[in-house]
Every structure is written in structure tokens, then in C-alpha cells.
Design a protein with these regions (language model features):
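Positively charged, low-complexity intrinsically disordered leader regions
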Residues: 1-56, 60
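Active-site cofactor/substrate anionic-group-binding motifs, chiefly glycine-
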Residues: 42-43, 47-95
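Glycine-rich phosphate/diphosphate-binding loop of Rossmann-like nucleotide-binding domains
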Residues: 48-60, 142-220
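Short, structured coil segments at secondary-structure junctions
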Residues: 65, 95, 115-117, 172, ...
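Anion-binding alpha/beta catalytic cores of soluble intermediary-metabolism enzymes, centered on
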Residues: 90, 97-168, 260
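Rossmann-like adenosine-cofactor binding region
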Residues: 195-273
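Adenosine-phosphate binding glycine-rich loop
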Residues: 255-256, 261-304
Length: 304
């Protein structure tokens, strides 16, 4: 693994290795701390949009591994005043051992990675959220054991979370269903990847059909527009029936796990009652962002 830009960068063996290392690092941290695997290493934490979990978990993770993490808002860099991306990449690659970047366009991230000359990690783009999906898979494995054969259902907007969860779930040997309105389908290349897995992947616009007998149901914010705007009102109409409610989840397995990458808009993609009922696994999922990201850093920078 040279970078982590999207889930399809990983082989099934690499995915399993990341989860295994994350388990080890989590156990060590609970016992008092991990070895300084990143001693002398520097990590740029570059953010072009707001973040709570990604920023703080990377800051804490780099510190726990003995490295130095520097947060930077791209609006405060010369890149925010028009300096070409390729110049920023070539400069930061000479200062830092690794760059984490949360930005908008996946194409910008991939161009940056080609030029930086150091490992680059996707902290979220409009196309992919690999760190979050690694945390999801770690959480499922912790609570349910083997991932292979389990039914994973995503309900919501077929954007970054859906794209990454589909690929990650299939790489892990899961049966994956994506439930979304027709006009909010996942990326075309993700669907091409998924259809290679045949009956292990299913795409539907019917939430009740998709959730049937699911072991795990995941969702994410789908009303990403500014409240009160025409786009927001349109999304509220388009996603009627896609809220995770107790009634909808009746068709899933009785012990279904519910995951949410956060932040959650209660009353939109998930009801308050369902969120609170499944808060233990949702906040385990949030904690595991720290551990999987430490694993990725340890593999990329310390040969773990």
C-alpha cells in the first residue's frame, strides 16, 4: 500500500491487515500506550472543509504514535490564494513524511498524491471516505466476528460513504445491498466494480426490500444542503421513506447493528429513538476511526 485514496486501492489481504493492526494498536492503547512507531515522522493534516472526527482522531493518533501532526486550513495557505495544487504538493512532500487531506474533488487528491512523493491519505472527498469505512468494518468485526457472508445494507445518498462501503464490504467478503433513490445512485465505476461480485451485490430503491435480513444497516447524512434552500427541500422530498426507524428495521435481523458515520441529523436519515438505541455501536464506530487511522499510518510510515 503506497497511499490510501479510495477503498479499491486495497486488496482483500491489505484490508484484513489494516484491521488486524488496528486491533493490536487498540489493545495496546487500552493497556497504557503504543510504541512510538512514528518517532521523528511528520504528518500534514490539510483540511479544505470542516471536520470534527477526522481532524481530532488524526491529531490524537499521530501523537499517540510519537509523531508530529500539523493541522492546516487550506484557506490559510497560498493554495487558498491561487497557488497551483501541483506546487503545494511538491513543497509539502519535501517537508512532511505523509499528508492527510480532506478536500472536495477526488481528482485533486489523486493529482496531489502523484506529485507529493510521500504517502497521501484521503480524509474525505466527495467520492470516497476510506478511513470511515475501515472503522465501520473494524466495529462490525469486533462485535460480530468474521465479516464474510454477513449482510451489510447502506441506506441513503449514493455518495462518498456508499461508494466506499460498497467496495469495502465486498472486499471483506460481505453481502452488500445499497438502498438509494434512483437519482442518488453510487458512482458508475463503483457499480461496475460491484457487479463483478455478482449476487453478492444488490442495488435497490426499496428500503424494506434492501434491509430484509440485514446483519448491519448503515446510513449517513443525506440532506447536505443548507437548511431552507430549494435543494434542501428537494432532498427532503426525495428521501421520504429512507429514514431508519424502528418500523423499517423490523425486517432486518433481530440483533441488527446500526452504524452512522456522524454527524447525525436526527429526524432525517435516522430517528432519535433508533440512534439512541444503537448509540453504543455508533460511538464504538467513532472511536475506531482513531485506531484504523493509526494502523494506516503505522503501515505506511513504519512498515507495520
Amino acid at each position: 500500500m503506497k497511499n490510501l485514496l479510495k477503498m479499491s486501492d486495497l486488496s482483500p489481504a491489505e484490508l484484513t491487515h489494516i484491521l488486524d493492526v488496528a486491533d493490536q494498536l487498540k489493545a495496546q492503547q487500552k493497556l497504557g500506550g503504543t510504541a512510538p512507531l512514528l518517532a521523528g515522522k511528520t504528518v500534514a493534516l490539510m483540511f479544505s472543509k470542516a471536520s470534527t472526527r477526522t481532524r481530532t482522531s488524526f491529531e490524537v493518533g499521530v501523537y499517540q504514535l510519537g509523531g508530529l501532526g500539523n493541522y492546516m486550513n487550506t484557506a490559510e495557505l497560498q493554495a487558498g490564494r491561487g497557488e497551483p495544487l501541483k506546487d503545494t504538493a511538491r513543497v509539502l512532500g519535501r517537508y512532511y513524511d505523509c499528508v492527510v487531506w480532506r478536500t472536495y474533488r477526488q481528482s485533486d487528491l489523486e493529482e496531489f498524491a502523484e506529485l507529493a512523493g510521500v504517502p497521501v491519505i484521503n480524509g474525505l472527498t466527495d467520492y470516497a471516505h476510506p478511513c470511515q469505512v475501515l472503522a465501520d468494518l473494524m466495529t462490525i468485526r469486533e462485535r460480530r466476528g468474521n465479516l464474510a457472508g454477513r449482510k451489510l445494507c447502506f441506506v441513503g445518498d449514493g455518495s462518498s460513504m456508499a461508494n466506499s462501503l460498497i467496495v469495502g464490504g465486498l472486499l471483506a467478503g460481505m453481502q452488500v445491498t445499497c438502498v438509494c433513490p434512483q437519482s442518488y445512485r453510487p458512482a458508475a465505476d463503483v457499480l461496475m466494480f460491484a457487479h463483478k461480485y455478482g449476487s453478492a451485490f444488490h442495488l435497490t430503491a426499496d428500503p424494506a426490500e434492501g434491509i430484509q435480513d440485514a446483519d448491519v444497516v448503515a446510513t449517513a447524512v443525506w440532506n447536505t444542503a443548507q437548511p431552507g434552500t430549494p435543494e434542501s427541500e428537494q432532498r427532503l422530498r426525495d428521501f421520504v421513506g429512507y429514514q431508519l426507524t424502528g418500523k423499517l428495521l423490523e425486517s432486518a435481523k433481530p440483533d441488527v447493528m446500526v452504524l452512522h458515520c456522524l454527524p447525525a441529523h436526527r429526524g432525517e436519515e435516522i430517528s432519535s429513538a433508533v440512534f439512541e438505541q444503537h448509540a453504543p455501536e455508533i460511538f464504538d464506530e467513532a472511536e475506531n476511526r482513531l485506531h484504523v487511522q493509526k494502523a494506516v499510518l503505522a503501515i505506511l510510515l513504519a512498515g507495520k
